Amino acid sequence: MEQAPAPKISFVSLGCPKALVDSERIITRLRAEGYELARKHDGADIVIVNTCGFLDSAKQESLGAIGEAMAENGKVIVTGCMGAEPEQIEAAYPNVLSITGPQQYESVLEAVHRALPPIHNPHLDLMPPQGIKLTPRHYAYLKISEGCNNRCSFCIIPKLRGDLVSRPAAEVLREAEQLVKAGVKELLVVSQDTSAYGVDLKYAESQWQDRAVRARFYDLAKELGSLGAWVRLQYVYPYPHVDEVIELMAKGAVLPYLDIPFQHAASSVLTRMKRPAAQDKTLARIKRWRETCPDLALRSTFIVGFPGETEQEFAELLDWLEEAEIDRLGAFKYEPVQGAASNALPDQIPAEVKQQRWDALMARQQKISARRLKRKVGTRQQVIIDEAGPNGAKGRSKADAPQIDGHVYLSSRRPLRVGELVTAKIDRADAYDLHGTVAGF
């Protein structure tokens, strides 16, 4: 008897790396049940759109993706952050099959089952232990918790994803171990608030291999560093205990890289943001961090044009950047977000002023980045290869996260492979990227 064709699903994943991990988990479950992935909407039986709802611009992108799926297919399931407040989706597209919020994996699967029942195939390949990944094979995002306990005035993430819920340390480490066994060379540790990991569990111990490991930021980072892959820490809130992890970086256990969204430098703006406001103390910490680990690369994000931001406060931000010498920077022009407390603040900044300040911030950062990268000319850097061609390759140093940071462009006298780790001599630098030659050949 001929086997019925497997039902096909097209998948759209929008938003941050945390949402990408949610997409990977849904796809892994669906593939385990026999569903196949289609490359195009019109070749699928159904479309799933994992939305982003953090900013109004992200909501518009999500609505556009839903509209495209409706036009090309007509059978659409919506999930993700925007689904937590479904009214806007329902108003625009009343005929979508289902709308669910973030992390509601079972609800998504139930919606798929209702619209497109699975066909059992006893000859299906078993799922790989690491699950289905949407990233290239050599790196993977490792999500260690959901939600956030902070209440920044501009942010609605706690409303969308709830309070902090950490995974047991052993569970995280088992997943990381499977990823490394499958060939992953770089683990990108992500969450809404990575350095708060384990607070909700009261740092409870769990058994991994032959020992107990505490659900604590430092302990988890140390154990991840023992697996033999690059470990990159992202979305770190600047709590005092972050200082402890710098020692691990100095020893080479985890990458000398910290992604800390400082958001601003003027204490008055930070107070309105409901963020830590003692940036003078932060400068002293950054100095100590670099004394302990001279190779430390700092990435951060900042918001310009926050309600009430004066010219003096913006000037404080520029001056602080010069002193802190942030290596990598992302900047956002403040957007009111439905449900955010900052919407009620007085003195909203005109759009043209936000643009001027954004331009000035990025111009200042370009000079800082160029200055810091120039210091690497003549040094040797370890590089992971992301793209390879017949005469060279594009990769990243330990100071560069995928998708958001710079690149290292390499020439080589031998073919290079994606995922390969090589040592490169840096020949020159520009504002954001390095250029070099693979050493030893």
UniProtKB/Swiss-Prot annotation:
Residues involved in [4Fe-4S] cluster 2 binding: C148, C152, C155
PROSITE patterns: MTTASE_N, MTTASE_RADICAL, RADICAL_SAM, TRAM
Domain TRAM as annotated: residue spans: 374-440
Protein keywords: 4Fe-4S, Cytoplasm, Iron, Iron-sulfur, Metal-binding, S-adenosyl-L-methionine, Transferase
Classification via SUPFAM superfamilies: Radical SAM enzymes
GO cellular component: cytosol
Subcellular location: Cytoplasm
Cofactor note: Binds 2 [4Fe-4S] clusters. One cluster is coordinated with 3 cysteines and an exchangeable S-adenosyl-L-methionine.
Keyword hit for Iron-sulfur: yes
Boundaries of every Radical SAM core domain copy: 134-371
Cofactor: [4Fe-4S] cluster
Class of enzymatic activity (EC top level): transferase
GO biological process: tRNA modification
Record GO terms (molecular function): 4 iron, 4 sulfur cluster binding; aspartic acid methylthiotransferase activity; metal ion binding; protein methylthiotransferase activity
Pfam family name, one: UPF0004
Record EC number: 2.8.4.4
Catalytic activity: L-aspartate(89)-[ribosomal protein uS12]-hydrogen + (sulfur carrier)-SH + AH2 + 2 S-adenosyl-L-methionine = 3-methylsulfanyl-L-aspartate(89)-[ribosomal protein uS12]-hydrogen + (sulfur carrier)-H + 5'-deoxyadenosine + L-methionine + A + S-adenosyl-L-homocysteine + 2 H(+)
HAMAP family: MTTase_RimO
Family (UniProt): Belongs to the methylthiotransferase family. RimO subfamily.
Function: Catalyzes the methylthiolation of an aspartic acid residue of ribosomal protein uS12.
Protein name per its UniProtKB record: Ribosomal protein uS12 methylthiotransferase RimO
